[in-house]
């Protein structure tokens, strides 16, 4: 599988308003400014598909993209709003939590979450909480280390080992990516291709609230 075409579908503050057509969903999650929009653009080879911003925390909606529409490899890519951005009021934090919980509670087509972390930094408590939530809920996820071009290959193992320890994953289970160089794109495409063929029985709806989502700081 490869991504041949992509288009923006809608932005929404509530997942319940999205009248999907039953396509598999791939969600992209991560801390504000981790590079979600840049990664989506690199995956789709479309520099202006997802809007990037120098202001962390600007994306406050669920953004939906249709990938490979009209083909056997069609799916929806869901860009989840970033977490962990400090400069928001309590009302905004509450809306973020409700939006995210609403998505995970109501999405029947979610196949996998691409959980992004910045390879240069140790995972935050929010990252750890997010991975714990996904793991406890039985939702498949793939940890993706962004901005891999910012560190030397010789020192990469040190950084991935630290991320693996924090998130209870082996370093070789991580995918290192760079939106600048295209590194890791083929691995992610294979991961997505396998995920969209998966059944959805893995999600136990009774477990979705056992672990709390990270708080929007």
Predicted regions and their residues:
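Conserved G1/Walker A P-loop phosphate-binding module
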Residues: 1-87, 202, 210-216
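Canonical P-loop GTPase G-domain recognition
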Residues: 3-16, 150-205
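Helical mechanochemical/support elements of P-loop NTPase systems and associated helical scaffolds
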Residues: 22, 48, 61, 73-76, ...
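Hydrophobic aliphatic residues
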Residues: 43-47, 104, 167, 192
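Flexible beta-alpha connector loops of hexameric P-loop NTPases
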Residues: 83-93, 120, 149-152
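Conserved C-terminal guanine-recognition region of P-loop GTPase G domains, centered on the G4
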Residues: 98-172
């Amino acid at each position: 599988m490869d991504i041949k075409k992509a288009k923006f579908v809608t932005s929404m503050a509530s997942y319940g308003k999205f009248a999907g057509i039953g396509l598999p969903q791939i969600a992209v999650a991560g801390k504000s400014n981790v590079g979600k929009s840049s990664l989506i653009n690199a995956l789709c080879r479309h520099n202006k598909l997802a809007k990037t911003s120098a202001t962390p925390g600007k994306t406050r909606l669920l953004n939906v993209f249709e990938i490979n529409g009209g083909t056997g490899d069609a799916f929806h890519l869901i860009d989840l709003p970033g977490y962990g951005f400090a400069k928001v009021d309590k009302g905004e934090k509450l809306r973020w939590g409700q939006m995210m919980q609403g998505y995970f509670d109501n999405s029947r087509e979610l196949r996998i979450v691409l959980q992004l972390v910045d390879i240069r930094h140790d995972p935050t408590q929010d990252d750890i909480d997010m991975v714990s939530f996904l793991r406890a809920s039985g939702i498949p996820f793939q940890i993706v280390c962004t901005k891999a071009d910012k560190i030397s290959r010789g020192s990469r193992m040190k950084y991935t080992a630290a991320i693996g320890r924090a998130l209870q994953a082996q370093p070789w289970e991580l995918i290192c990516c760079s939106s600048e160089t295209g590194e890791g794109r083929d691995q992610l495409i294979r991961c997505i291709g396998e995920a969209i063929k998966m059944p959805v029985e893995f999600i136990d709806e009774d477990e979705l609230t056992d672990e709390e989502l990270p708080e929007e700081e």
